[in-house]
Amino acid sequence: MKKVFLMIALLLTMCMTTKAQAAVYGDVDGDGHVTINDVTVLYNYILNDDMTYFSTSDVDGDGYVTSGDVTVVYNILLGLIPQEDTHEYVDLGLPSGTLWATMNIGANAPEEFGDHFAWGETTPKEVYDWSTYQWCNGRWNKMTKYCTISTHGNNGFTDGKTELDPEDDAASVNWSSQWRMPSKEQIDELRTKCTWTWTTSNGVKGYRVSRNGKSIFLPAAEGYSGSILSSGNLGYYWSRTLGDTRSYYANYLYFHSTSVTAEAFERSSGCTVRAVRVSQK
């Protein structure tokens, strides 16, 4: 079995544009073709000038394989090219430097409700209750992740986690790693450091939240319990922070026309998400 080494830079485009790195193998047939990731490439074809042949006893003077079956070893170079983030935010001049998104996850305009999520889940669904909740074994006292109280965990389970991991964060998963669901502290800061004005924007009721001459609009997007969406112009916005005294609760922002509070709510319920990021100044 003959061998020849070659270098290929492979560009993959996904949510992030990446170059991957690995040592992998492909088979070259008797006609001098190599199959790489199911793509047949001629030996004398230089792909973006990144394919290189090394002179060895298995390669002729021109740098090409002459005959026989060979095993080809090639490398894929690793690099990260971040895709441009198109999600808009507002700098309200908050002490923490937190930047708030202009619309909810799943929305296309500030007045749209967007998607509803159970806490720690990253896709919307039809029914929001304990039987469909990802992080329990069918009941509120059988948590399987994010549990600090043994009587609320499945068979006494605890893991000490009080904030969502990025892979369970609806903002990070649906937008990018630059975004997070807000912490309880970030919600408290928004609630106490800004002016909240109940208003109607493009026919949708909600709060205009203002500071430093700038503002965001939070629609009263309601919330799901089971398959029922609440009514009454209410707002339920998840934080990424677990409840303090009940591991089956998580902290959230709750409001109606005359009150804005930070409370805790059953994790299985469906609430909206307004993402945050931290200023890079």
What label would you give each PLM region?
Residues 5-84:
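Cellulosome-associated attachment modules in secreted, modular CAZymes
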Residues 84-281:
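C-terminal, surface-exposed recognition/capping segments
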